[in-house]
């Protein structure tokens, strides 16, 4: 299904690029007005990259205090998207890093304890499954962790 969507999108973009170039072939159009869709797209990309370099430095220095800057490491800094109309920047902040732990502690009614024999299974379940890596499945993750804690392997010691 996704492959079909990509194919349709590529085909649509291809036809748009071809037709935009052919519409400009009339003799009444001056050279200044003769710009293809591809030229416009490339210009917008170049402008946004230049604007991003200039504005992101200014905004990061102005919006974050030194405590917030120290708290956020480099991959967690907000991502700024420049707007075409130069009104305001859109800020995208990352999710709370401890949110998964908070959710699971809430759903299991307290911290879940694991013995040393269960540590490997807990680590695999907590860090490598879809249930524990996506916020929509945290409730399912809490149920799986509770079942693991009650399993005979983990109850031995």
UniProtKB/Swiss-Prot annotation:
InterPro entries: ALKL1/2. Pfam families: ALKL1_2 (PF15129). GO terms for biological process: positive regulation of ERK1 and ERK2 cascade; positive regulation of ERK5 cascade. It comes from the Eukaryota. The keyword Secreted applies. Keywords: Secreted, Signal. One of its GO terms (cellular component) is extracellular region. Residues 1-23 form the signal peptide. GO terms for molecular function: cytokine activity; receptor signaling protein tyrosine kinase activator activity; receptor tyrosine kinase binding. It is found in: Secreted. Belongs to the ALKAL family. This is Protein ALKAL-like. It comes from Tetraodon nigroviridis. The lineage of its organism: Eukaryota, Metazoa, Chordata, Craniata, Vertebrata.
């Amino acid at each position: 299904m996704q492959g079909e969507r990509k194919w349709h999108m590529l085909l649509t973009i291809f036809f748009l690029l071809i037709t935009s170039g052919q519409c400009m072939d009339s003799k009444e159009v001056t050279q200044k007005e003769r710009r293809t869709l591809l030229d416009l797209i490339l210009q917008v990309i170049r402008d946004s990259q230049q604007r991003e370099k200039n504005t992101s430095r200014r905004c990061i220095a102005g919006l974050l205090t030194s405590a917030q800057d120290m708290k956020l490491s480099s991959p967690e800094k907000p991502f700024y998207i420049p707007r075409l109309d130069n009104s305001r920047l859109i800020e995208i902040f990352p999710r709370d890093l401890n949110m998964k732990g908070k959710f699971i502690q809430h759903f299991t009614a307290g911290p879940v304890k694991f013995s040393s024999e269960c540590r490997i299974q807990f680590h695999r379940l907590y860090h490598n499954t879809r249930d524990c890596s996506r916020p929509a499945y945290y409730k399912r993750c809490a149920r799986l962790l509770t079942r693991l804690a009650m399993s005979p392997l983990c109850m031995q010691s």
